[in-house]
Structures are given as C-alpha cells and as structure tokens.
C-alpha cells in the first residue's frame, strides 16, 4: 500500500518535471534565437530535454494538447496577425521568407490577406499566453514554433524591420479584372447610360432607407448626397474601372482628397479606383503595340509579361526585358481613350449633375475646359517622353530624386517605355520611423517649390503612386510625366509674393497680388475678399513659423472648407488657368505630408527658395 502511494507520488513528480522541462526548455530556445550563443544554447536545451525525457519515461503529455485548444489549426496564420505576436514583433506585417533571402512581397491595399502554410504560428482566434517575468512564471507555445524559427529567421526579421519599405515588385490589384475596353463613343455612352439608370434606382433605395430609420452620414462633405450612397458609389467605381479614360481620371482625383471634400464611405471606394482599373485583354494590347511599334515589336524585346502589373486611367503597365537584360516598364494606352476625352467628361458631368447641385461660383465649364486640355496632354505619350527627359536633365545628380530613362525605340504616341524602378509608393511608407517620414515629406514639399519657382516646370499629378521610395538607396523615383506643364514668369513673379506675404502675415499684399493674378476682379463683396485672404493665410501657416509644423494634426483642410461656401457664393470670375493644376499639386503634396504624419519646419525651406528666386529675378532684370 505504502509502496503504491510512493509510486504514484513519483509518477506525479515525473509529470511535473516533464512539464517544467518542456516549458523551460521552450524558454531557452526562444532566448537562444535572440542570443549570440544561439547554436550552443539550442544544443544544450535539446540535450537537457533528451536526458529528462529518458528519466521521466516519456511522461503523459496529453494535458499539453488540452491546454492549447485548436493547436492543429496553428499551421495557418494571417500574416497581419503574426506581426502582433511577441516573437514576431520584429517583423513588418508583409514580411515573408521564401528562398532564404528574406525578400518581401507587396500586397496591394485592399487585397484579401491569404494564409501562410507551415509557418507554425497560431491563427487569429488563438491567444498567446502572457509572460510575467516579475513572477518568474513562463508559459510558451508548442515546440513547432521554435522548430521553424531559426536564428537566421530572426536576423532577417530584424533587417526587414529596418527596411519596412524596401524595394518590391509591383503587383496588380486583385480586384482588377480583364475586360475589353469600350473603344467606340457609342459603346462608352451605353455604359454611362446604364450607370445613370442604376444611380436613379440606387438613390430611391437610399432615400427609402433613410426615411425608414436608416442613419444619414453625419459628415458634412461637399459631395454628400443620396445619389452618392455607398451602393451607388460601387456602381460608379465599376463603370469607371470598365470604361477607364477621362472619367476614371476624375474618379482618381477624387480619391486623393480627404473626407472634408467627399464623404468617408465614398473615399474608401474611390481608393479602389486610384489603385487599379481593370486591364485590357492580351489581344487588345497586342493590337495597340502593333499599330504603334510595327509588326516586329516583339523582336525589340527579350520578353514581356502578358498581364500588366499596374492598370491606371489611361493605360496599363507591363514588365518586360530588353535583349541586354535590362528590365523595363512599358505603358500601353487603352484604345479609344484619347478620342473620347470630350464625350467622357460630358457624360460624367451629366451623371454628376444628377447627384449634386454644382454652384455657379465653381465655374464648372472653365474647370472642365482646363481638365480636357490636361487630359489630352496625358494621352500624348510622345509629349510625356519629352517631359520625362526634361525632368531627368533638371534633376541630374540630385541626391534624392531619380527620373527613369526613356527608351525611344519602344515609345510612340500610345506607348512609352522606361526603365523599371524598385520601391514602394509613398502611401506604403506610413509605418516607417518618424525621421524617415519627415525626410521623405521634406524632400517632396521642397521639390514642389523648386518645380514652381526654380524650374517653372511642374509635374502636376500628385497621385501617391507617382512617387516610389527605395529605402536601400534612400531615393525617391518620380514616375508619370503626362501632366507636366510650364508656368509663365509673370505668374510665378506674383505667386511667390502671395506665398511670402502669407508667411509673414501681410494680408494687404496677399489681396493686392491676388488681384494681380486675376483671382479677384476688384469688384467682389468684402465677404469674398476676407474669405479669400483668410484661405491664403491658412495655407501660408506651414511656412510662417520656425518651429516644426505638424502635418498630421493640422486642421488646414477643415478650416478652408468652412470658407468655401462664401467663396462659391460671391466669386465673380474663374481663377487663373494656371492655378487649377498648381493647386492640385500643392494640395496633393500637403496631403502626402499629412498622411505620413510628418513634422518639420518649412520656413527656412521656403525662404531659401524665395531668396534664390529674387536673385534670379534681379539677374533677369539686369540683363534686360
């Protein structure tokens, strides 16, 4: 009897010892992965477990399985969830190791996150056991975790953390579909007609939902309307992604506004428009290449991928390789887009006028005239190639910005080929450290000022995907030069004085120079003059103080929005033609800084540009 009780006690002690060995051995392994003595510690831990396992006779471990319910599902893991776990805290959310090199893969924003097999990490519905070092009570997970996580994996994770935005190859958004581009005006009109009918039905449903207890958006956005409900926004996006061209370009412009301009539900859906349109089938792409480059176009390439890695409003981009091995990006324009600019904009405006009432002070006709001219520029790839070469020459030797090389032998009116660049668009840089984000945004804003006041030649499309950041080289690659334009000297002479006056609080000079620029006729109501000057002063705040300006917390957009109703009500003349593209670019640059939550002083940046401009101005006048 006594002997049997002793044996039971010993058996129980054996189980306790085995469990203790397992948990403490697990701790040793995790410590080993982070230690310079990793290999030796790992071997020691394995030896201890081997000896203890023999002594304890392979104790019953069923309690371990019971304790970690659902352990058989741990082979599948959501990559984003892994980043939240203690051991994986050194990994960026999109880190994966495929071939031992620790390469990263880019997942398009909004794409569904897949599962990773064999990663050995718990699934999302599994909670990690807390570790309390102060109580000396350690509990860890199953052996398979450490078995799949070597010291080399940890080192690669640490390196990846320092290069969250390391260069990766672009991928087409998973939402994009292969669909023939409607190339004739009649086929494009049919799509817009179907959209108008769908919007009407959707608006009736939205009004009914609001009338019977549905909640109306509380955001007082300018484009907030029952006709622009989320369901109707889906209809708009699907149509724009199908027809592409000028209509899609307008949708992409809306996507980079903040929710002070459009309601947040629409903004999320228009974000899909910005990221990727549908792409044309291979036969349609081949037809364009043959018409532009001739029947022997394939002989100029070593290879080309049939499916594009990016699809935008006017064209899609394919990866290719030259006979010498150089990688290229070939942008191919959708058929019928250039010929349909005027009709597309008229069709879209007809739909938009159903949705919102456009105030007279918006001068929509003037805006559309400027927009049509700019879209015609963007459809001329020969013009874009010249602009890209001009920018490449202006920024030659620049320590930050790089313009890819253009290959003339593979470029024409509807095809432009440039060298392939590696990096990530700026909206993927939000997780970089504060110092790096500040540096990126400082350079972007400084370039904006240099383009206007030094080059008097600006790339006016502020789409975040037109700026690719390469963390390994610490360079920003500039892409898409279709929207480039010159600014006359007389315009910049007055405009720089407006910005300078705003930075020093000189309201009288702001008003005078605004009249010189034809923003005002001189016959406007006092309310309009005050609102205009106040809007300019708000925009000048970033350049007014020597202290760091916090773009992430500023309320610039909201404050200007409060002035818009007054300006639209009392405006007597459309703004100067140059201001449309200029203000789009400047607003986009500020939004980049806001999205990346940058903090830096802008005053000296502007003063350097201003003083250099005044010196050049004096030199020009002395020569005359």
Swiss-Prot record:
Pathway: Cofactor biosynthesis; ubiquinone biosynthesis
Phenotype seen when the gene is deleted: Morpholino knockdown of the protein causes nephrosis phenotype of periorbital edema and total body edema in 54% of embryos at 120 hpf. The glomerular structures are altered, with podocyte foot process effacement and disorganization, rarefaction of slit membranes, and disorganization of the glomerular basement membranes.
One of the record's GO molecular function terms: ATP binding
Residues at which ATP binds: 313, 331, 418-421, 466, 480
EC number of the protein: 2.7.-.-
Keywords: ATP-binding, Cell membrane, Cytoplasm, Kinase, Membrane, Mitochondrion, Nucleotide-binding, Transferase, Transmembrane, Transmembrane helix
Keyword Cell membrane attached: yes
Record-annotated active site: 461 (proton acceptor)
The keyword Transport is annotated on this UniProt entry: no
Topology versus the membrane: Single-pass membrane protein
Residue numbers covered by motif KxGQ motif: 249-252
Motif interval(s): AAAS motif: 310-313
Cellular compartments per GO CC: cytosol; mitochondrial membrane; plasma membrane
Quaternary structure, from the entry: Homodimer; homodimerizes via its transmembrane region. Interacts with the multi-subunit COQ enzyme complex.
PANTHER family: ATYPICAL KINASE COQ8B, MITOCHONDRIAL, PTHR43851
Domain notes: Adopts an atypical protein kinase-like fold: while it adopts a core fold similar to that of well-characterized protein kinase-like domains. The KxGQ motif completely occludes the typical substrate binding pocket. Nucleotide-binding opens the substrate binding pocket and flips the active site from inside the hydrophobic core into a catalytically competent, solvent-exposed posture.
Function: Atypical kinase involved in the biosynthesis of coenzyme Q, also named ubiquinone, an essential lipid-soluble electron transporter for aerobic cellular respiration. Its substrate specificity is still unclear: may act as a protein kinase that mediates phosphorylation of COQ3. According to other reports, acts as a small molecule kinase, possibly a lipid kinase that phosphorylates a prenyl lipid in the ubiquinone biosynthesis pathway, as suggested by its ability to bind coenzyme Q lipid intermediates. However, the small molecule kinase activity was not confirmed by another publication.
Name of the protein described by the UniProt record: Atypical kinase COQ8B, mitochondrial
Organism: Danio rerio (Zebrafish)
